[in-house]
């Protein structure tokens, strides 16, 4: 009788019993560089600063007019001064506060001015071509139009969400009889103010 071959189960058991090599350490996630208001050089003129201060004061809800706004008002003040930061940008320059801090934490004008300077320097405005290309994705028939209902849904639910009233204001008079919107004409309309 020939000698028995070793059973593969034993070899498998030996392989399984061998210590597994240590997993490679996970790469450290990239961290957002924190916004440092002290590092921002203010380039505004004295007249501009006075104008900004006046607008800022309109948002001040403190009982004694302390020239303070809540974190939640910061984006509104920036937009009132002609900037268009995303909500994410506003949260980043505020140090990513918790949602419950947005209406309790405040900042004064001296803290706000570097934020305004930073946001005004770092505008990333899309071009006409960028917006047309973005809307072309929704042009299923490649005829230069998008469905108004679909555009309404996208504007109200994706990215920087708009309210239904804002969407209606934006799209008033843009749809044809079939409920379609010529997106090149729409982008020209939006970019003209």
From Swiss-Prot:
<feature type="region of interest" description="Disordered">
    <location>
        <begin position="1"/>
        <end position="36"/>
    </location>
</feature>
<dbReference type="InterPro" id="IPR011992">
    <property type="entry name" value="EF-hand-dom_pair"/>
</dbReference>
<keyword id="KW-0505">Motor protein</keyword>
<feature type="domain" description="EF-hand 2">
    <location>
        <begin position="126"/>
        <end position="161"/>
    </location>
</feature>
<feature type="compositionally biased region" description="Basic and acidic residues">
    <location>
        <begin position="1"/>
        <end position="13"/>
    </location>
</feature>
<dbReference type="GO" id="GO:0016460">
    <property type="term" value="C:myosin II complex"/>
</dbReference>
<keyword id="KW-0514">Muscle protein</keyword>
<protein>
    <recommendedName>
        <fullName>Myosin light chain 4</fullName>
    </recommendedName>
</protein>
<keyword id="KW-0677">Repeat</keyword>
<feature type="domain" description="EF-hand 1">
    <location>
        <begin position="47"/>
        <end position="84"/>
    </location>
</feature>
<keyword id="KW-0518">Myosin</keyword>
<dbReference type="InterPro" id="IPR050230">
    <property type="entry name" value="CALM/Myosin/TropC-like"/>
</dbReference>
<feature type="modified residue" description="N,N-dimethylproline">
    <location>
        <position position="2"/>
    </location>
</feature>
<dbReference type="GO" id="GO:0031672">
    <property type="term" value="C:A band"/>
</dbReference>
<comment type="function">
    <text>Regulatory light chain of myosin. Does not bind calcium.</text>
</comment>
<dbReference type="GO" id="GO:0051015">
    <property type="term" value="F:actin filament binding"/>
</dbReference>
<dbReference type="InterPro" id="IPR002048">
    <property type="entry name" value="EF_hand_dom"/>
</dbReference>
<dbReference type="GO" id="GO:0002026">
    <property type="term" value="P:regulation of the force of heart contraction"/>
</dbReference>
<dbReference type="GO" id="GO:0005509">
    <property type="term" value="F:calcium ion binding"/>
</dbReference>
<keyword id="KW-0488">Methylation</keyword>
<dbReference type="GO" id="GO:0003785">
    <property type="term" value="F:actin monomer binding"/>
</dbReference>
<dbReference type="GO" id="GO:0060048">
    <property type="term" value="P:cardiac muscle contraction"/>
</dbReference>
<comment type="subunit">
    <text>Myosin is a hexamer of 2 heavy chains and 4 light chains.</text>
</comment>
């Amino acid at each position: 009788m020939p000698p028995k071959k070793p059973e593969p189960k034993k070899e498998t058991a030996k392989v399984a019993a061998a210590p597994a090599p240590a997993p490679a350490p996970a790469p450290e996630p990239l961290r957002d560089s924190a916004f440092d208001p002290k590092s921002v050089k203010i380039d505004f003129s004295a007249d501009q600063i006075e104008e900004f201060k006046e607008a800022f004061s309109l948002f001040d809800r403190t009982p004694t007019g302390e020239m303070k706004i809540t974190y939640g008002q910061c984006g509104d003040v920036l937009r009132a001064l002609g900037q268009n930061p995303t909500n994410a940008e506003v949260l980043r320059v505020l140090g990513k506060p918790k949602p419950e801090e947005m209406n309790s934490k405040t900042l004064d004008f001296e803290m706000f001015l570097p934020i305004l300077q930073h946001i005004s320097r770092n505008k990333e405005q899309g071009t006409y071509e960028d917006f047309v290309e973005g809307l072309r994705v929704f042009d299923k028939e490649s005829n230069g139009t998008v469905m108004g209902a679909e555009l309404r849904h996208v504007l109200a639910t994706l990215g920087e969400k708009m309210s239904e009233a804002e969407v209606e204001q934006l799209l008033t008079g843009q749809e044809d009889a079939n409920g379609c919107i010529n997106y090149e004409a729409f982008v020209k309309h939006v970019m003209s103010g």
